[in-house]
Amino acid sequence: MSEAEGYPGTGRVLVIIPTYNEAENIRLITDRVRRAVPSVDILVADDNSPDGTGGIADELAASDNHIFVLHRSGKEGLGAAYVAGFGWAKDKGYDVVVEMDADGSHAPEELPNLLDALRDGADAVLGTRYVPGGSVHNWPMHRLLLSRGGNIYIRMALGMPFKDATGGYRAYRMSVLDAIDVGTVASQGYSFQVELAWRAYKNGFRVVEVPITFTERERGASKMSGNIFKEQLLRVTVWGVQARRDMLLNRLGRRPRQGSTWP
């Protein structure tokens, strides 16, 4: 397969990189992606960054026909940026989309591992920090405990087997995103990642985890906030209650209400 046809065994791949004030990072991350997997394309989805990230991305796109830019009107959140990117990818005929942070916390050099898992039969691949071979660097202990504890709670509440449902480095076949109606996802932050994994899992797709190395950003400001964690906790709790209610109704021979799965 030639570079123009995409990554071997997966087809055309688009790496979506949402940005908001990532002027210090965008050149480096796009360069690393291009070096790691030259056959993939990159979409920078910029939320009208006041630091000029969008303009830098335009310069990169002008000099590299594998880089594209989606300019959005303002800061609408991570989930909305990815949903817009997914729609762009579908319109352009891509077979696979990859989620990747702009700050370098997700190593582009590990991207072949995610794509190879798709080639080997997975429908969706979660880059995972908490399996053998995975690791986290430069996180304070309280952050690591919150992440670990949150993932344990997600497994208990939703019954998903995944060790790391909140991670943001992952790859999906476009057919999966079409089937789970990704356009109706309203979550942001970590809960957005949980919801996508939950929908894919509930719809019977083969979702696998591969180990990744997560390194906290060295440049720029983190977008993490307490509200993101609170949203995740609330939504996961509601989804878990609804899932158990639907299981009970099924056992009683009653049909769960349509449209009640996602708050």
Task: Pin down the residues of each PLM region.
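Hydrophobic helical membrane-anchoring modules
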Residues: 1-10, 159-160, 182-263
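Cell-envelope/extracellular polymer assembly enzymes that use nucleotide-activated donors
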Residues: 12-14, 41, 195
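Acidic helix N-cap motif at the loop->helix transition within catalytic regions
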Residues: 24-28, 51-60
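Residue-level signature of catalytic and energy-coupling elements of molecular machines
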Residues: 26, 33, 85, 103, ...
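Short beta-strand/loop segment that forms part of the nucleotide-sugar
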Residues: 30, 39-49, 70-71, 100
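Acceptor/aglycone-binding surface of glycosyltransferases and processive sugar-polymer synthases
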Residues: 68-91, 96, 108-190, 217-232
